């Protein structure tokens, strides 16, 4: 299939280009656009399926792959804000890097995009507030999963589809740039717990991870092992100027193509 969009409707969530005024009001179950997969004369979109039950993590090991990963995260945040209905969307953005790096500043996420969503941006000075929010999100995951099982549903998306508009629960999106910047082990462990079960409960974590970071548990002096966190995420690993996929369920097929993250509009 030479051109995916010849036979598939280009939506805000999955299309390569989109107009900020063209907002759609639905859960983006068709996937979020990450960039293009290219191989020979074939070009296909790389899509992240929010409903896969896994989070999404870009690994990076230098400034170039960091810029690529964070630019794609910005674009994903915009697509989420443009697609998920405002009364069902709680968008939390955490900047673990230098506050001067302008990742997802308020001026970039303008009111036309955000509408009345609960946009909350945290830097290192607000880590206590962010950690409290992680605790609230984890408690919410436990409660939601109980309600989902009682209703005999697979996940929150399926549960919400069976409820009236006023009864539907919000989807919560955590966008984390430059993890683990400024986060202590308590916050990291809580985030890991959220990633393990959060997607099915409508709590989604999309992040970039600085592989150069030295994370040590202050209690045991042992280094942090990221395997528990990353095993529950679709992971994109830097390979020169591109990235390869891990833990997507289709790694062997996808990695026959060259993938470069989509640049911001």
Descriptions of predicted regions:
Residues 2-25:
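Long, low-complexity segments enriched in small/aliphatic residues
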Residues 2-4, 154-157:
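Long, charged, glycine-rich C-terminal linkers/tails
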Residues 17-154, 161-261:
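P-loop NTPase catalytic phosphate-binding loop
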Residues 265:
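Conserved glycine-bearing catalytic or ligand-binding loops at nucleotide- and phosphate-handling centers
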